[in-house]
Amino acid sequence: SISSRRVADELEGMLKAANDKATVKAIDDDLANKAAKVAKDNSGALKVETTLKADVKTELTKNNKLGDSYIWIAYFATKDVNKTVKAQNIAKALIGTNGKIDTTKAINSSDVKVGDKNGAAIEAGNKFELSMKDFKVGDTDYVMVVVTCKAQVKAAS
């Protein structure tokens, strides 16, 4: 959608501060839609964060999907939230206190593999993809954002 492309552009600017080669492409809402579907409990309330993240991880990595990619999520109420604030909220989910892309903040960070390499031997690549879907919690409008990035083996420093 146009709104997800605009948010992707804003986010790209923010991520470039952490990784000057970063690009962010808006993709369809499929991943975010799947994430939003498992975000609420049976009563329709938003799950507590740890449960929500675990359930989204289970949903998005079914059948070993995205095993070579980091998955970050952000979700928040959208009342009075413009594209810049949306992008800032998403950037917070990806960037660590050191100002770099933080793969430990990815919901599946401990499971990502590149060939037989994992953990500290791998890092996020440069191509980020953003999936965004609006959903409701009671009467409140929320957005679910899923950002994925293929992992790569760290270059020897």
Give the ranges of each region predicted by the language model:
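Short, well-ordered surface patches within globular domains
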Residues: 2-65, 126
